A protein has these predicted regions:
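Intrinsically disordered, low-complexity terminal regions
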Residues: 208-218
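C-terminal/domain-terminus segments
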Residues: 67-69, 161-185, 190
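Short, isolated positions within intrinsically disordered regulatory regions of eukaryotic proteins
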Residues: 9-11, 200, 212
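Short, glycine/charged-enriched secondary-structure capping and boundary segments
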Residues: 116, 183, 198-200
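A glycine/serine/threonine-rich, flexible loop-to-helix segment
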Residues: 194-207
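Glycine-rich, phosphate-binding/catalytic loops in enzymes
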Residues: 84-85, 184, 201-203
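Flexible, glycine/small-residue-enriched loop-and-beta-strand segment within the central core
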Residues: 2-6, 10-159, 187-188, 195
């Protein structure tokens, strides 16, 4: 462990995990003989970290989160309750993920992923200004709104927004905003879910669009 780590009750930590690893700027300060303490890592109650997990300083994991083997979470991230980080996922810095989500693949800096969303593909910056250096460019990140899916091998590029209850098919490429309740295939081919004729998504679309039960008030 590097720095301070705060554990909730009944947390499980596997073998060879690294918690509270300093961000790059703090390591550079140490090379110059200047030492400082980063923000603590906070692990919520009943969270589970499997083997060889790396979590950088200042990251907060909500209650009952699960982080699988060899996943990496950068500094200053916020991971909501009951979210699963799948094995080998690479989550960069300052990423915000909601509750009950499932995340794999590569997630670039400052990405926002909404509640109950599933991201199996890659969310990346455009990286159009390499001349400014690695830390010189400040690009807008992708935003994945609640209840959306990014399939395996799909790639969302740049500061685009994926609307709620949208489905990015496996292998698709997205470089522009996607409205709510759309399916994206190929390269930016968008189809409203009420016009989607495929059978494989029919159950999910029905789940998204069925009327929500309401509780009668006394």
């Amino acid at each position: 462990m590097y720095g301070q780590v705060q554990f909730g009750d009944s947390v499980i930590v596997g073998e060879q995990c690294v918690l509270g690893y300093p961000k790059e700027a703090r390591l550079q300060e140490a090379q110059d003989g200047r030492h400082s303490t980063g923000d603590p890592v906070v692990i919520g109650e009943r969270a589970m970290l499997f083997n060889q997990v790396v979590i950088h300083e200042g990251t907060v994991l909500g209650n009952e989160c699960l982080v699988e083997d060899r996943a990496r979470i950068g500094y200053g991230c916020e991971i909501g309750e009951r979210t699963r980080v799948v094995h080998g996922a690479y989550i960069c810095d300052r990423v915000r993920i909601g509750v009950d989500a499932c995340v794999a693949g590569f997630i670039c800096d400052a990405t926002v992923i909404g509640d109950r969303s599933t991201v199996m593909g890659d969310l990346v910056h455009e990286y159009t200004r390499p001349d400014l250096g690695w830390w010189g460019a400040d690009e807008a990140p992708p935003v994945i709104e609640s209840d959306s899916v990014v399939g395996f091998g799909a790639r969302v590029v740049g500061g685009v927004r994926i609307g709620p209850r949208s489905y990015i098919a496996a292998g698709a490429v997205v470089t522009r905003d996607v409205p709510a309740e759309h399916v994206v295939t190929g390269i930016n081919i968008q189809t409203p879910i009420n016009r989607w004729a495929g059978r494989r998504l029919s159950a999910l679309i029905e789940h998204w669009t069925k009327p929500q039960a309401t509780t009668a008030r006394s």
